[in-house]
């Protein structure tokens, strides 16, 4: 990825003429966009590049051209769906992520684990979890990370209604945060949450 340029004081993350994707053809083309503090949504149909954009923003996918500028702190991005994580326990996942984020909130993690019914699963390997519970492992870490920028890919997929409501409540509060950004990629944006920006792909 190109060397980041100084970031505007208005934004905690921004792109300049960013192009890239997982294959030879870029799903994201010449994207110039800025994300301020608050809650943001990236919408699009299947195959439009939602996940690719999050990976580009996180530095998990190299850009073909353009640049990403991030405020001097940290970005949370984690994908625990791959088979390489199957043998890792829930607690081990959290333990591995914790040192990367200096503002990690262990008390919040405990509260979220309780709210999302994951406390009893801490010692289980990820391969033993349902798709929804596996997603909760990432979500709990993301929300407890304290990262300046948190990237969430389809956070409600395969979740039970109680957990969806708990995540929605958290994001409603996050929308008012003065210095942190949550960027969510999903098919549709919620109609009852105050968004700082909405980007359609």
Give the location of each predicted region.
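A short, flexible loop at the N-terminus of ABC-type nucleotide-binding domains that lies
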Residues: 1-37, 62
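ABC ATPase nucleotide-binding domain signature region
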Residues: 41-44, 52-99, 189-191
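Conserved ABC ATPase "signature" region
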Residues: 106-121
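Conserved ABC ATPase signature
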Residues: 125-132
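Hydrophobic anchor residue at the start of the ABC signature
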Residues: 139
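A short, proline-enriched helix->beta-strand linker immediately N-terminal to the Walker B motif
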Residues: 144-148
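ABC-family nucleotide-binding domains
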Residues: 153, 159-160, 164
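Conserved catalytic loops of ABC-family nucleotide-binding domains
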Residues: 170-192
């Amino acid at each position: 990825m190109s060397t980041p340029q100084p970031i505007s004081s208005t934004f905690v993350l921004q792109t300049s003429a960013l192009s890239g994707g997982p294959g030879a053809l870029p799903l994201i083309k010449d994207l110039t966009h800025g994300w301020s503090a608050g809650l943001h949504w990236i919408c699009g149909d299947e195959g439009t590049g939602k996940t690719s954009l999050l990976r580009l923003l996180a530095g998990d996918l190299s850009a073909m051209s353009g640049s990403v500028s991030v405020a001097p702190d940290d970005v949370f991005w984690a994908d625990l769906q791959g088979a390489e994580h199957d043998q890792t326990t829930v607690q081990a996942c959290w333990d591995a992520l914790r040192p990367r984020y200096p503002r990690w909130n262990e008390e919040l993690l405990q509260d979220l684990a309780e709210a999302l019914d994951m406390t009893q699963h801490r010692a289980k390997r990820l391969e033993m979890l349902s798709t929804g519970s596996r997603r909760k492992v990432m979500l709990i870490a993301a929300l407890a990370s304290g990262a300046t920028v948190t990237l969430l890919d389809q956070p409600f997929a395969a979740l039970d209604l109680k957990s969806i409501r708990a995540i929605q409540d958290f994001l409603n509060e996050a929308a008012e945060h003065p210095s942190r950004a949550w960027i969510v990629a999903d098919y549709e944006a919620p109609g009852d949450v105050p968004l700082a920006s909405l980007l359609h792909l």
